[in-house]
Amino acid sequence: LTVAQQKLFFDYMLSHPKDTHWYPVFYVMANTGMRVGEITGLRWSDIDLKKGIIRVNHTLVYYNHRDEKGCYFSINTPKTKAGEREIPMTEGVKQAFLMEREFQSQAEISSKSRVDGYDDFIFVNRYGDVQNQGNLNKALRRMMRDCNDEILEKYGADSDPVLLPQFSCHILRHTFATRLCESGANLKFIQSILGHEYLC
């Protein structure tokens, strides 16, 4: 996403009450570069709001088998040492976590999922179940459509307005890496934040 598209996306969520609850998970995604399974697997014990640190040491994986196993979640640990890491939190990311906590408190939502001994997940749906990539991408597609429809209705296609492109959760990880590159961040630092063992 460009800077303008990224701003449009987050402004849209904040200005539309029915979508504001999605803001924290997507904001954290776009401002930490974490993989979607790392985000959905985050527990409150994995973050330190005082020190401003996110500890990444596991991934939540959703299996959709078309056999007797059916659909289920599992926890995986990183394949490489680089995958296990600490990510510094910006003030915006910290506020997103606090926003999520406040939203859940007001809506009387709490994590009810237990996966391979892991519980107290941060990002859960209204039933207290962990989120999965399919549901997050579905929410993205709907918000892209609604946002673009609203802009085109207001300004018309001839005005060449900023619109949201088609994108997925994984694109938010790329967007984070792009913003780091644009800021002149050291490649080794980018590699460590993203959890890559080798530079591409």
Feature-to-residue mapping (PLM):
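Basic, Lys/Arg- and aromatic-enriched nucleic-acid-binding interface segment
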Residues: 1-42, 50, 61, 82-84, ...
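C-terminal catalytic core of Y-nucleophile DNA break-rejoin enzymes
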Residues: 2, 55, 64-65, 75-99, ...
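Short, basic (Lys/Arg/His-rich) helix/loop patches that form interaction surfaces
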Residues: 7, 11-22, 32, 87, ...
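Flexible loop/turn segments at secondary-structure boundaries
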Residues: 35, 62-64, 131, 200
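Residues in the helix-turn-helix
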Residues: 38, 53-55, 189, 200
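A short, basic/aromatic helix-end/turn motif that makes direct DNA contacts
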Residues: 41-47, 191-197
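Short secondary-structure boundary/capping segments
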Residues: 46, 76-79, 112-113, 161
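Short, flexible, mixed-charge acidic loops at enzyme active sites
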Residues: 60-74, 112-113
